[in-house]
Amino acid sequence: MNEYYEPTLLFRQNAVKKYSPELSPVSSMSSLDLPKSNNSSSSWLLDNHNPKDTEILNKSCSLNRLNIKSNYWKIPDNDMSLTSMALSRQGDSNKSLLGISSANDDSNLFIYELDLAENYLTHNNTISLPNVHAMRWVPQMGNNELSLITGNSKGYAHLVSIPNSNEEGQSAEIVKRFNHRKHLKSINKDPSIASHTSTDITKLNFMDKSMDLLSLYDNNLFLWDINGCDSQVRPKPISISSIPGIVNFDPIPHSSNSVGICGQFGVSLFDTRQPKFSVPSSVMKQANKRKLGANVIRWSPNDDNVFAASHMDGVIRLWDIRKQDYFASLDGHQGKKIISIEWNKNDLFSGGRDGNIVHWDLTSDINEYPKPDITNCGLKEGLNSIKFNPVKNSVEKTINQRQCGTVLPASNTNIVDMCSVSLTSHNEEDVKVLSIDSSSFLGLHSKIFDAVKVNINSEKTYYTDDDISLLLAAQQSSLSTLVNDSTENVTKPLTISRMPTTKITHDVAPPAIPTPASVVPTTPNMSNDTLAEGPDEFVEVGDIIRLKEPKFSFSNYNDSVFSVDSNHDIKSSPSSTTSRGSFGESSSSISTNPTIVEASPISHKRDPSDIFNFKTDFDFGLGLNDYKFDESLVDRSFDRMLSLKTNATNYYSVYSS
């Protein structure tokens, strides 16, 4: 018997240990090799070679889905209060003008040029137009003029003329001003702000193939004629419809009079030629009982009879106007409120307050009629996508459920707005969608089946030196993300990649990506937001930039002028040697020079400690009480790390699934 205490060697099935006296007590403990005949009785163990076991693990942990590529840019909005976005295609090319608005008082309207094919973002202008909550690009009817409609928080919509990027010395100008509050008297409503439930213009859109503008203000739907407003000193709406409980609308494609509306009453069709609208009390009771009140509605671009609507229970339902009920429901946000819905061909994207964007693949059966009997569509990955039978050790399918949703974790906070993108490409599978979130990130998400072209066999059990070199080559970074017209400064975006998961049996981890110690990030100034000379007098510039009205014998708000100064002072990355061709003939920076500058340039430098400083509730309905923020997250390693290197920093990440 030993003179010292020795713990008892416990016996457990499949974990038998043996002791060798000639070795130390630690090194002498080794596992006994189990006979192959005993493997049949160990069904509770995870077997990597068992398709049933790997199917459950891969499906629940999202390990077997396709690659999805995402690019991210940081928008220089100090208060992180982005409200809306709008995209305007430039002819048949893959370049588009992108407008992003904020609820701030100044420097809150950002104009970018986006190259959809190469994923480049070029900053053009920054404009001060206070408290923008909705906007829409005006359709170009055979001219090259760029105009933007914006709606603010005080019931005013502005028609703004945006200078082209190649026009130097030009200023942005407010062409017309549409006063919504003043015209409420015509429908016997009090125009005072105190009597309104909301003073924000929450939605702007144009009727299909026309210049008729629809705007939503305080449960009222306004219809304006943009073409006819030039001859009016004070534009008047064509019609005003009071619709209690209305939240959103969407014009029907290929129709000049019909609009789909949604709200507390559910979903409905509306004819602009009949401005009177009433909801029966029985319909309201049924909508509240079934939780069919809706906040977003979008018509299918390929079928004028089908539309999608997000409802109060966090479920998207597909409706056919030839039926009195929905024919499919899409549940993928776990009851969270859905903020935006976008169609792209027959694909549907939804973004919610959970920070996820769900891609719904409806290509196979959306065009069939009568519609397939699919009453429930769910996610094809994640814990909610599987039903496990422990007796049969197999995955069971839910009856009448079609799993067609793919989750993209796009944001750590919540999605604010989305915009669908169509590429001019021969590849019909090129599907992209833009998003902005409450952390002031702009995301470009691509449905690409070969997002990372790295020829690594997924069945390998180790990385070779060539594989590691190839992985590191795909993770080369660049300090510069915005590009200008100079051939010397065109660089690829900053990239942060996460490769497809492979099994590694060796203890040696792949080497970390070296970071140059000599690189010092700099923050160039944004456009020097200034105000220009008005038609009758100079505009005074104080600490807060505002538009000053010209003095006439009558009160006219249609001639206010302001300017922007575009600064493309973007430097090349010292750590990247790749270059591309220029976007234009000129190698000089694009700029618009103001007439009078009475204020110092506005710098958008920000302190890292203020990145997640939520000072107040957002005016567009995303308050601090809607989610909790952990300050310790600032020190963690995000897939989309915040950067102060440029005015709008680009991130590239691959969600391997």
From Swiss-Prot:
The region called Disordered is annotated at 565-602
SMART domains in UniProt = WD40
The yes or no answer to whether the keyword Cell cycle is present is yes
The WD repeat boundaries are 77-122, 127-170, 196-234, 287-329, 332-370
The protein's UniProt keywords, in alphabetical order, are: Cell cycle, Cell division, Cell wall biogenesis/degradation, Repeat, WD repeat
Q: Which Pfam families match?
A: WD40
- What SUPFAM superfamilies does its record include? WD40 repeat-like (SSF50978)
Residue ranges annotated as compositionally biased, kind Low complexity, are 572-592
PROSITE patterns on file: WD_REPEATS_2, WD_REPEATS_REGION
InterPro entries per UniProt = WD40/YVTN_repeat-like_dom_sf (IPR015943), WD40_repeat_dom_sf (IPR036322), WD40_rpt (IPR001680), WD_repeat_RBAP46/RBAP48/MSI1 (IPR050459)
Q: Name one GO biological process term.
A: cell division
Is Cell wall biogenesis/degradation set as a keyword in this record?
A: yes
Q: What does this protein do?
A: Involved in cell wall metabolism and required for the separation of the mother and daughter cells.
In the record, the note on similarity to other proteins reads: Belongs to the WD repeat DSE1 family.
Q: What is this protein called?
A: Protein DSE1
User: What species is this protein from?
Assistant: Debaryomyces hansenii (strain ATCC 36239 / CBS 767 / BCRC 21394 / JCM 1990 / NBRC 0083 / IGC 2968) (Yeast)
Its organism's taxonomic lineage begins at:
Eukaryota, Fungi, Dikarya, Ascomycota, Saccharomycotina
Per the record, the gene is DSE1
